[in-house]
Design a protein with these regions (language model features):
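N-terminal metal-binding scaffold of metallo-dependent hydrolase/deaminase domains
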Residues: 1-45, 56-58
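Divalent metal-coordination and catalytic microenvironments
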Residues: 14, 31, 55, 66, ...
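Histidine-centered catalytic micro-motifs
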Residues: 61-72, 230-239
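Alpha-helical scaffold segments that flank or form the walls of functional sites
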Residues: 75-126, 131-151, 181-196
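Histidine/acidic-residue-rich catalytic or RNA/ligand-binding cores of hydrolases
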Residues: 76, 164, 239-251, 279-284, ...
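Metal-coordinating catalytic core of metallo-dependent amide/deamination hydrolases
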Residues: 131-273
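His/Asp/Glu-enriched, well-ordered alpha-helical/loop segment
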Residues: 259-266, 308-331
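A conserved active-site cap/scaffold subdomain adjacent to cofactor or substrate pockets
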Residues: 276-278, 284-321
Length: 331
């Protein structure tokens, strides 16, 4: 055995398994499934370790495609309960403006641990709040993910359109465009792992049409294409956002995304989309690489790969994804 590899583990004779030709389980080595063991067979190469799984059901690792780890610290804030998106954000922004490095480490660890306990082995997070002193927020998240052993697509979120510029967030949680782009490039160079078997990847993630400038949206698309990384954003979450885009940008959210160069191909983009648009521009063209984590996407089904996501972690719930998977499987 190569000294650089870990011992093979045979997860043996599961009660049930969601895979064909694996009735006797799977063999795992170095974080990969290297063999499916069919009924009546033994592993081709003897496993060094065996886990008796006769009381267990073996499922693939679940993938969470949207989260806000830091919001786990503000669950069930009374003033934020039962509010629409914009008022909800306005209540919580002042609390998030007080985030510290320790708070980001704690919230990231908590959120990822909850996801792992629910069967999630790969997660995305969208961190976009960077008050003074939290410039290394994504570095802290990378360290937490590595410590826990969870694969992660961590997005370098951003906001540069504050209240004084006609945006929603307060001035003390936004950054300027040059700072955002420079840090985005730094994080990709330092942490992004391309190719098969990647453990940590970085994506670029302007928060929303009502919290970033058009200039930043366009510059992010250009940078993502140059660095060959994905993009991520919120889009068409509420009717408030639709109205905002019509008033400020003179178009609906999806049309605005196209104007900003986000629908031109490249590595692809992912949206956390909550409400179904009412305009005739209801979906991206099928050839455009996209993933959407929506609440209702029946009319978008031909064009999109749907995914499970955790939205508003500041709600009084844990980051358990199993119940959401059931919903996805039923639709």
């Amino acid at each position: 055995m190569n000294s650089d590899t870990s011992p093979a583990l045979w997860i043996k004779d599961p009660l049930a398994i969601l895979a064909d030709g694996a009735e006797r389980g799977v063999v795992v080595q170095d974080g990969r499934i290297v063999e499916l063991v069919a009924a009546g067979r033994e592993p081709r190469a003897p496993a060094v370790k065996t886990f008796d799984a006769d009381a267990h059901v073996v499922l693939p690792g679940l993938i969470n495609t949207h989260h806000h780890f830091y919001q786990t610290l503000t669950r069930a804030v009374p003033a934020a309960l039962d509010r629409e998106l914009f008022p909800w954000l306005q209540v919580l922004y002042p609390l998030w403006a007080r985030l510290t490095p320790e708070a980001v480490d704690l919230s990231s660890t908590l959120a990822m641990a909850e996801l792992m306990l629910s069967g999630c082995t790969l997660t995305t997070d969208h961190h976009y709040v960077f008050p003074k002193g939290l410039e290394d927020g994504i570095d802290i998240q990378v360290a937490a993910a590595k410590r826990l052993g969870l694969r992660a697509l961590l997005t370098r979120g951003s906001m540069n359109r504050s209240q004084r510029d006609g945006g929603l967030p307060p001035d003390n949680v936004v950054q300027d465009e040059d700072t955002i782009l420079a840090d985005s490039e730094r994080l990709v160079a330092r942490y992004h792992q391309a190719g098969d078997g990647a453990i940590i990847q970085i994506a670029l993630a302007p928060c929303s049409p009502f919290s970033v400038t058009t200039s930043l949206m366009r510059a992010t698309a250009e940078l993502a294409e140059r660095l060959n990384v994905r993009m991520h954003t919120h889009l068409a979450e509420t009717e408030d956002e639709n109205r905002y885009c019509l008033e400020i940008h003179r178009c609906r959210p999806l049309d605005y995304l196209e104007e900003c160069g986000w629908l031109n191909g490249g590595p692809g983009w992912r949206m956390a989309c909550i409400s179904t648009p009412t305009s005739s521009r209801a979906s991206p063209a099928p050839e455009r690489p996209s993933r959407i984590a929506p609440a209702a996407t029946r009319r978008w089904r031909p064009a999109l790969a749907r995914s499970a996501r955790w939205k508003r972690p500041a709600s009084p719930l844990a980051s358990a994804s199993t119940a959401r998977l059931r919903t996805i499987l039923r639709t």
